[in-house]
């Protein structure tokens, strides 16, 4: 079974040429983790150590490589580092950074190419006139490959140039698109700004409506909250009353228990008195028993002393009996006395036995007295314990009674305070409810007013919209009238130029008639002196209206009305102003008065434009009549 490698070599040939580079293809399996210090070595077959490599290259991995994935890679062994042609077999070995062998390739050799392998046969058609004659060319493969490589490089350069041109076109297209996008963004922003303004207005109206709705909802919520609070207060009041009733029942139960405990305490006191009397009796009896015990102990001591004396006397008698036994043989004559003494001894022994029995009885009495004393001491201790427990229970009962009475007093005080606070809270709630009812009424009135104002605002908004529509329509009409006036002004200007040319021709004709001009020359200085002497009249004539001047850059109505006015007689001072040839000869150089008249005429022109449709109609009606009258009057009027 073949060993499974963590790296697999692919497309390994059996023979390579040392004059060209060698490509080593391999696959990194998921079991192997690639590191930057992994390398691939070219080893001779039969190698024993990783240091016996002929040459090596660092193993590479693509930038998108991730651990735990399978990836195909390729490295190049340059021709300068490859071994020469020989029969020695080589193999690729993949070594990781730790020096472990990850894979070995199949064996291959390096051999020089044969001469026939370097030649390539090409078939070319003949360029002559004879058809069917072909040429066979035999060239080296390296030359063929070199020519193909040059063609490929040339194609690559052309493709790169085309790519650069395409990139430039793309950049220009991007710039144009960016400019178009900027213009569109500008228009879009303007439209969005307008839309935002309209949305802002709509939002403001909606916010107003929402505020009104919120206020109304707050008022309704406040009313509901007040009703809920009122219900909660009523429920709390009922709960407090129920609690007060329960506390009263608890107080009754506690008072009854206190009375029962007082009776139990009286009973305990009586029992304590009885136990104290019994204790006194027991103490007296104990004292008597102690006295009796002391007496019996004294008797016992005396009896023991007697017993010791009797024992000593008995010992003496025994010794004497022994002496008598020793001397019984010699003292036979004293036998009777000995028998008497023996009888006396027997009596003494009987007395001793009786004393011993009395001693045993006294000891038994002492034991019984001791047991009784122990029982009495135990009874006394139990009585003391019971008395102590009774005292503790009495103290606890007194404390509980005091606590119950204190709790009863506190409960009554709290109940009174809670009752007062509840009454005060009820009164405050009543006042609050009244205030809130008043506030609700006021807010309802305010809400009605707000609704009325909102309806008025909606109506005013509709009116404003209608006014805006009317203003836009009137603005369109005024624009049209302005265009008509401009066309009419151009026509009047053209007509005035024609009149000026005619007046110049007429003035030349009149100046040629010297005979008729002598009288007019004599009268003209007088008239000019009269103008100098009376400038107010001249100013009045100029300020009387826009009909008595020849300014061409003024209101069109003044130019139209100028020829329509009949020329006054030469005796009037206004004739001097009208018949002056200076404005006609130099119409583009008006005096200060003409400037003032032109400014006034411009103001009147603005007033005429703001006048609307009526002024335009009047101007349109006056134009044909003025033209006809002007032509007739110019034909009849003199030059001066």
Swiss-Prot record:
Among Pfam families, the record links this protein to: CALCOCO1 (PF07888), SKICH (PF17751)
> Where is composition skewed (Basic and acidic residues) in this entry?
278-288
Keyword Coiled coil tagged: yes
Top-level taxon of origin: Eukaryota
- Region called Disordered, residue ranges: 262-288, 519-640
InterPro entries found in the cross-reference section: CALCOCO1-like (IPR012852), SKICH (IPR041611), UBA_autophagy_assoc_protein (IPR051002)
Does Aminoacyl-tRNA synthetase appear among the keywords? no
* Disulfide topology: none
Q: Where is this chain's protein located in or outside the cell? A: Cytoplasm; Nucleus
- For this chain's UniProt record, which GO biological process terms are given? positive regulation of transcription by RNA polymerase II
Q: Which residues form a coiled coil?
A: 141-212, 246-346, 424-510
GO MF annotation list? transcription coactivator activity
Composition bias, kind Polar residues: at what positions?
576-589
Can you name a GO cellular component term? nucleus
Q: Which UniProt keywords apply?
A: Coiled coil, Cytoplasm, Nucleus
Q: Which family does it belong to?
A: Belongs to the CALCOCO family.
Q: What is the annotated role of this protein in its UniProt record?
A: May function as a coactivator for aryl hydrocarbon and nuclear receptors.
Q: What is this protein called?
A: Calcium-binding and coiled-coil domain-containing protein 1
Origin organism is: Danio rerio
Q: Which gene encodes it?
A: calcoco1
């Amino acid at each position: 079974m073949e060993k499974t490698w963590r790296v697999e070599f692919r497309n390994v040939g059996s023979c390579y040429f040392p004059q060209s580079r060698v490509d080593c293809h391999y696959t990194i399996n998921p079991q192997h983790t690639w590191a930057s210090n992994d390398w691939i070595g070219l080893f001779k077959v039969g190698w024993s150590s990783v240091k016996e490599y002929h040459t090596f290259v660092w193993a590479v991995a693509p930038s998108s490589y991730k651990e735990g994935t399978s990836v195909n890679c390729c490295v190049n062994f340059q021709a300068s580092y490859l071994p020469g042609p020989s029969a020695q077999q080589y193999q690729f070995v993949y070594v990781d950074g730790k020096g472990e062998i990850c894979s070995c390739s199949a064996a291959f050799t390096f051999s020089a190419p044969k001469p026939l392998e370097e030649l390539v046969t090409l078939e070319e058609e003949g360029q002559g006139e004879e058809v069917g004659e072909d040429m066979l060319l035999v060239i080296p493969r390296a030359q063929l490959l070199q020519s193909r490589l040059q063609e490929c490089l040339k194609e690559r350069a052309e493709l790169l140039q085309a790519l650069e041109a395409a990139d430039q076109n793309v950049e220009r297209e991007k710039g144009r698109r960016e400019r178009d996008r900027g213009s569109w963004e500008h228009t879009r922003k303007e439209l969005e700004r307008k839309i935002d303004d309209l949305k802002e207005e709509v939002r403001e109206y909606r916010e107003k409506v929402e505020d009104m709705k919120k206020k109304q909802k707050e008022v309704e919520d406040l009313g509901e909250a007040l009703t809920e609070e009122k219900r909660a207060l009523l429920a709390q009041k009922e709960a407090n009353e129920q609690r007060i009733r329960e506390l009263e029942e608890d107080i009754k139960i506690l008072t009854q228990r206190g009375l029962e405990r007082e009776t139990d305490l009286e009973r305990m006191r009586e029992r304590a008195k009885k136990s104290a009397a019994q204790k006194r009796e027991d103490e007296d009896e104990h004292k008597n028993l102690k006295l009796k015990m002391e007496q019996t102990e004294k008797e016992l001591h005396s009896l023991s002393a007697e017993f010791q004396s009797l024992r000593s006397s008995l010992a003496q008698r025994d010794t004497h009996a022994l002496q008598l036994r020793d001397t019984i043989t010699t003292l036979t004559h004293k036998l009777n006395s000995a028998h008497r003494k023996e009888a006396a001894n027997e009596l003494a022994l009987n007395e001793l036995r009786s004393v011993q029995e009395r001693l045993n009885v006294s000891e038994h009495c002492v034991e019984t007295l001791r047991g009784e004393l122990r029982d009495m001491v135990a009874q006394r201790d139990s009585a003391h314990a019971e008395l102590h427990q009774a005292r503790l229970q009495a103290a606890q009962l007194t404390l509980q009674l005091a606590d119950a009475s204190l709790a009863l007093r506190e409960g009554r005080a709290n109940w009174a305070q809670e009752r007062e606070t509840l009454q005060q809270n009820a009164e405050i709630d009543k006042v609050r409810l009244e205030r809130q009812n008043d506030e609700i009424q006021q807010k309802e009135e305010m809400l009605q007013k707000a609704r009325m104002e909102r309806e008025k605002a909606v109506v005013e908004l509709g009116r404003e919209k209608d006014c805006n529509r009317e203003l836009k329509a009137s603005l369109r009409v005024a624009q049209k009238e302005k265009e008509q006036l401009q066309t009419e002004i151009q026509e009047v200007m053209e007509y005035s130029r024609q009149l000026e040319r005619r007046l110049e021709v007429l003035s030349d004709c009149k100046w040629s008639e010297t005979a008729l001009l002598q009288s007019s020359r004599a009268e003209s200085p007088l008239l000019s002196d009269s103008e100098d002497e009376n400038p107010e009249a001249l100013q009045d004539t100029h300020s009387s209206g826009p009909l008595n001047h020849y300014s061409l850059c003024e209101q069109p109505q003044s130019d139209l009305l100028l020829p329509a006015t009949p020329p006054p007689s030469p005796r009037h001072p206004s004739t001097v102003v009208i018949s002056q040839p200076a404005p006609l000869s130099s119409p583009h150089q008006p005096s200060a008065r003409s400037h003032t008249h032109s400014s006034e005429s411009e103001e009147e022109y603005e007033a005429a434009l703001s006048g609307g449709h009526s002024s335009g109609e009047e101007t349109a009606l006056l134009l044909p009549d003025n033209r006809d009258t002007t032509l007739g009057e110019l034909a009849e009027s003199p030059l001066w």
